[in-house]
Structures are given as C-alpha cells and as structure tokens.
C-alpha cells in the first residue's frame, strides 16, 4: 500500500509492515507532487491495531535518527523496491527535503490489494510510478546487452584501423593550459588563500540559505543560473531543496572557476582565452543535468519507464559509435527524414560544369526577365552549399532567382587524399576562375556579381586582390556573408590555432592527406557545448528520445574534409599570421593588396557571430579600396544570413561606410525590422540594372550534366 493525501492534508496509511525500507522510501525528496487526495476503501485485509501513542519511535541503525512509528509506515500488497537514492538519504533529512509536515496518522480502513498497488505506483517517492520490477529486471539485462554493442563498435573500429587512436595530445594541451592557471595561483600564497576563501564563503552562504529554506523561510537563491539556461528548466530544480542545492553549488563553482581564469592577468591573452575555453568544456560536461542521479527529470523518466529509456539510449549510442567509426558521433537530428533533392536543396537547376574540385550549378529562372549580370555564389568548403537552399521557405537561392537573378552556385567536392596538394591557388583557379569561364560560356556575359560566404568569402577576397594585380575585371561587384579578411580578432576558432596546435594539425593532415570533417564538426560543436553536445547527450542517451527532425542540424552534421595544402595555407596565413590584410600574402608569386580592390562591396556581418565576429568583419571591410556598404544582421553565423524576407525573425542595422571604431558605428546605426535580403537586392540592382530575357540552364554552350543539387554534395564523410 502507499501513503495517500487526504482532503484535509493529512496522510492515510494502508497497511503496516516492512517498516524500514518503506519509511526510507517515503523520506526521499519527491521530484513532483501528485497533488491528488486518495480514498481508501475497506477490504478483506484485516486492520492492524495502532500502537499506543506513548510508544518510543524506532531509530535508524545507521543514523540513529528517529523514524515514524511502525503504524505510520505504509506497506503495499507487493512491497516495491525503494529507489536506489533512498538508502543514501537519512530519513529525517530526506523527509524534510520532501517537505513532509508530520508523520502520517493511522487509519482504520484498508484498501483492496489492487487499488493499494495502484496507489503505491501513483505516489512513488520520486513523483513517478514505481518501476515494474519484472520490466526493470528485463531492461537491466537489455541494458547490459546494448552496452556490449557500444563496446564492440568502439573496439572493432580500432581493430580495423578506422578509428583515431588516442587523444593524448588534446588532453595534454588541456592539462598544460589549465595547469598554467593553477601555477598562477599556487605561486602566490595570498592569491591562493583569497581564491579558496572566496569559494568557501559562497558555500557557507549556500548551506545557510538551504537550512533556512528547510526551516520554512522563503529565501532568494545564492547562485541562480541564467534565465536562458535550458538545462535547469524543470520546476524541481527550484522547488526541491535537494536539487536546488546541487544546481546552485554547480553554478557557484562554475562562476568561481571562470573568474579565476579571467583574473589570471599575468598570463598572455591567448593562453587565458584557451584556458577559459577548456574550462567551459569541463564545466559543461560536469553539469548535474548530464547525470541520471542528479537530474530530477531523468529520474522521473527512468522510474516511469522502468529503465526502458536507458536501453533505447544505449542502443542509439551503439549506432552513433558505429557511424563515427569508433568515435561517438552524437546525432543532432533525425537525418532519415531529409533527402537531398527531395525535401532539401530542391530549387530547380542543372549542373553545367564539373572538374576535380567543384560542380557549377545554374538554377532555372522563375521570371520572364532577369538582370543581365549573373550572380556567382562561392560557399565555404568547410560545410556544404545547401545551407542557402535548405527548403523553399528558407532558400536564399530560390528567393534570389525569384528576384530576377541568374544564379550560379559552386558545389565543392568532398575531397580525399588524392586532392591533398590542392591549395588556395587551386581553389582560386579551378574554383572561381573556372566558374567565371563557365558562366560566360553559358550566358555570354563577362561581367558577374559574386557572393562569398565565410571561408568562401576569404577566398573571394584573395581572388579579387589577385585579379586587381593582373587587371582582370570580370567581377564587377562583390558581397561578403560573414567573411573575414583580417584575423586579428578572429573569434573563437582562433583558440584552436597557435604554433603548437597548428604543427599537430599539420602532422595529422600529412598522414591522411586531409583534415577529417568530424574534427572540424567537433570544433564547431565545442564552441557551444551545452547546446550542441550535452543537450543531445541527455535527450538521446539518457531520455532515449530520437532528436527532433531539423533541416539546419542535418546540414550542420553533413561535414566535409579539407585538403591538407588548402587548410594548412588557410590556418597559417590567415588565422596564425594574418597575412592578407597586412599585405604579406602571396599567390603565384604576387603580393596581394586589398586596397587595390576598387569594386563596390556589400559587407554583411552578424551581430552574435562567434565564428566571424561582427567587429572583425568591420575591421576587415576598411582594407578595401572602393565603396563598402556595411550591414549588421541580427543573430549569428547561419541564422543571421538565412533570415528569409517572407518570414524574417531578426532585424538588421545600416549606417555610414565602415571607419573609426565599431562601437561608434553601432551606436549611430539605424535599425530596420525584417530581413537584410531586401536591402541587398536593392543594392545589387543599383550596381547593374540592365535586364535580358530569362536564361534556361543548358541553353548556352554548356549542356546539363545532372540535376541540381548535383553529385558532389551527396558524398559524405
């Protein structure tokens, strides 16, 4: 039987017996209060006479604390096993944490066995049905079996040589960097004492606050998480003192550690930034929300499903380790719901040109007339181009076609070791230059307007500077989407690039011929570990839920490799040495000078971009020699760019040409609701307003090779 709340707020007791285990169970803090008052009917179970009120209470063998009298302890018809956490909590403290006002009063009526069992399930100590013991036993066996599959997937990849063996270098880098912070404090006794004293005082305040709360006071939190922190959204993180204490202790310690890093002012800025980044990885991993025993929602789910959720989760983990060839490749979306050319990248078009490095797609017109000047889009090769053509509602490509543009998009190959020697020069020659020649053959037009996105924008800037040196004027105007040409303040990715780390990356690329796409994907995920790693760890492997189908996350997981020569050049000459903006970069023996690029430029930055920070883009825009329209979009690196004109989520800011301080530009900028796409198309039309009859793919000198989105985009890592 179980304790049920009566309408008067007092507890009714079913049957006594097996006092110790049930009393402990009743004392465990409840994750959710059922809030239901139950009725107990008389049945065929003989009543138990209550003991005298003068009876001495029993004491716990472990704690010596008094427990409720035997007649106050409920005994179900089939006594359930108490949850594992029950035995770890002393009854008086646990009862206080659970908020029990007083021991239950005895009752003279008893419930029938069936109803009593249901009552016990409805009022489990953790606010969820108690697990079915038989189902739990089966699931434990299945859990062990699925765990074996995870181990088998892990080991088989290593035996076959597919897996990357060991992560000693990465771990060593983390330990070395954080060790320098520790040395900073250990080298000064006063500094170390102040740091320890600060944390001790905060914990004393937390203990005091918790005790006052257990005494019935309403007290504000000592350390509250940010309101936007979804990890602690479940009400029990605040309502239950036990979990509230764990949460606050975590938040407090995390902020204390982060402050230690920030105050280590004798470290060089790069080391301090790296330490902060690595600390963020550690604290994100150790969040109590990531563990079954310290997450109230996970405990409820596990009890309600008798552990079935953990079996499903481990099954998914085995699949993800196998898919990652011995590495855990956490799925962020259900990729089975999306198919290229069916419900992703569906804008009609044809591949009209192909070489070793790229396919060129020409999209079919949707207007009777088009601007005479075609548009060439140069996407990043770190990801795939269809982020600009996710679906009809979000597609920048489809929208640009509808505005009367003849759109061409480069789809980069997903390279293997055969393309290891393809460097920046090759991507310029066989990428942008080859595309310009193909566009002229397809349309008869020599003048082109171009867009470069992210590293595709950096390549476009390099190409424009090279074209200025050789007198090539085929690109008449250019747009940059979240692209950097100055890397002095290049954002979070710069944390991965210093002399030592670059040497390690170059060694790995020399062995394979490329940088594995999973390595780059992991780097991007580590920039937002709570959102892109640990939320899926909890959802997939602990809750046992398939992630929600989301096209953007499917694209995000569709990683690509980078040729060794190309990536080495990019990291060394851009991130490490910042050669492009400083005039030190050479291509084919020619020094590049961005000030010689005189064509009109539309420079788009995203306000919350952590990959190409808005300030960095602003600084880079000042190096060009022609007119520059700098526009600041709301949101980040992807959502700031893909902000559809028909259904905009964010705003944008416009102002004077980029000069002076970024903060001054922002203060004076004009905010406009809606999508920057509308502003951009007006700018494009102003650069070349002439129109011609619409051009169909294949109508020129180049015949179609395949339907869009082509073949190269389908090659996966």
For the regions a protein language model found, what residue spans apply to each?
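Alpha/beta-hydrolase-fold enzymes
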Residues: 266-301, 441, 445, 463-567, ...
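Alpha/beta-hydrolase active-site loop
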Residues: 421-442
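Conserved alpha/beta-hydrolase "acid-adjacent" motif
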Residues: 610-616
């Amino acid at each position: 039987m179980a304790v049920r709340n009566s309408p008067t707020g007092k507890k009714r007791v079913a049957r006594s017996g097996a006092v110790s285990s049930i009393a402990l169970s009743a004392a465990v803090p409840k994750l959710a209060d059922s809030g239901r008052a139950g009725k107990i009917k008389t049945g065929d179970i003989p009543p138990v006479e209550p003991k005298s009120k003068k009876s001495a209470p029993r004491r716990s063998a472990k704690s010596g604390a008094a427990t409720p009298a035997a007649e106050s302890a409920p005994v179900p018809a089939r006594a359930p096993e108490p949850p594992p956490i029950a035995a770890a909590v002393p009854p008086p403290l646990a009862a206080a944490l659970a908020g029990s006002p007083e021991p239950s009063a005895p009752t003279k009526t008893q419930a029938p066995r069936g109803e009593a069992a249901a009552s016990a399930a409805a009022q489990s100590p953790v606010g969820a049905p108690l697990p079915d013991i038989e189902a739990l036993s089966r699931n434990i066996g299945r859990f062990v079996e699925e765990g074996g599959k995870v181990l088998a997937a892990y080991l088989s990849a290593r035996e076959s040589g597919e897996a990357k063996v060991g992560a000693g270098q990465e771990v060593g880098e983390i330990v070395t960097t954080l060790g320098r912070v520790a040395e900073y404090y250990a080298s000064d006794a006063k500094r170390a004492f102040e740091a320890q004293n600060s944390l001790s005082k905060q914990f004393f305040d937390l203990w005091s606050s918790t005790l006052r709360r257990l005494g019935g006071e309403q007290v504000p939190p000592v350390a509250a998480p940010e309101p936007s922190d979804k990890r602690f959204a479940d009400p029990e993180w605040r309502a239950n003192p036990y979990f509230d204490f764990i949460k606050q202790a975590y938040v407090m310690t995390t902020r204390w550690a982060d402050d230690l890093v920030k105050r280590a002012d004798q470290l060089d800025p790069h080391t301090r930034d790296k330490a902060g980044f690595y600390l963020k990885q550690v604290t994100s991993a150790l969040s109590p929300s990531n563990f079954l025993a310290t997450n109230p929602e996970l405990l409820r789910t596990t009890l309600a499903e008798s552990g079935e959720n953990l079996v499903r989760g481990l099954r998914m983990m085995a699949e993800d380790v196998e898919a990652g060839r011995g590495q855990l490749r956490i799925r962020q979306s259900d990729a089975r719901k999306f198919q290229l050319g069916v419900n992703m990248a569906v804008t009609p078009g044809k591949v009209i040109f192909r070489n070793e490095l790229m396919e060129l797609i020409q999209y079919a017109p949707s207007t009777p007339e088009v601007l005479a000047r075609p548009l060439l889009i140069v996407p990043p090769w770190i990801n795939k181009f269809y982020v600009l053509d996710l679906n009809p509602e979000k597609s920048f490509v489809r929208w640009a076609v509808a505005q009367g543009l003849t759109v061409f998009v480069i789809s980069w190959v997903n390279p293997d070791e055969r393309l290891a020697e393809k460097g920046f020069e090759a991507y310029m020659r066989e990428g942008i230059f080859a595309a310009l020649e193909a566009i002229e053959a397809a349309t008869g037009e020599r003048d082109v307007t171009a867009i470069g996105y992210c590293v595709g924008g950096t390549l476009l800037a390099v190409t424009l500077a090279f074209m200025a040196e050789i007198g090539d004027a085929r690109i008449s105007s250019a747009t940059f989407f979240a692209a950097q040409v100055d890397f002095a303040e290049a954002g979070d990715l710069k944390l991965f690039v210093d002399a030592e780390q670059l040497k390690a990356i170059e060694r790995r690329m020399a062995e394979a011929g490329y940088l594995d796409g999973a390595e780059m994907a992991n780097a991007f995920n580590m920039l937002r570990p709570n959102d892109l790693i640990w939320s899926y760890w909890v959802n997939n492997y602990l809750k046992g839920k398939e992630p929600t189908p989301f096209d953007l996350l499917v694209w995000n997981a569709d990683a690509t490799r980078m040729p060794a020569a190309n990536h080495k050049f990019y990291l060394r000459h851009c991130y490490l040495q910042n050669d492009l903006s400083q005039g030190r970069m050479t291509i084919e023996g020619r020094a590049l000078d961005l000030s010689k690029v005189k064509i009109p430029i539309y420079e788009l930055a995203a306000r919350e971009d952590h990959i190409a920070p808005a300030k960095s883009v602003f600084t880079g825009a000042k190096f060009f020699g022609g007119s520059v329209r700098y526009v600041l979009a709301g949101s980040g690196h992807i959502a700031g760019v893909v902000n559809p004109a028909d259904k905009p989520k964010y705003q944008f800011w416009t102002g004077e040409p980029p000069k002076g301080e970024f903060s001054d530009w922002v203060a004076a900028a004009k905010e406009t609701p809606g999508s920057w796409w509308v502003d951009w198309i007006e700018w494009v039309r102003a650069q070349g307003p002439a129109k011609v009859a619409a051009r169909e793919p294949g109508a020129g000198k180049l015949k179609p090779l395949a339907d869009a989105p082509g073949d190269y985009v389908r090659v996966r890592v």
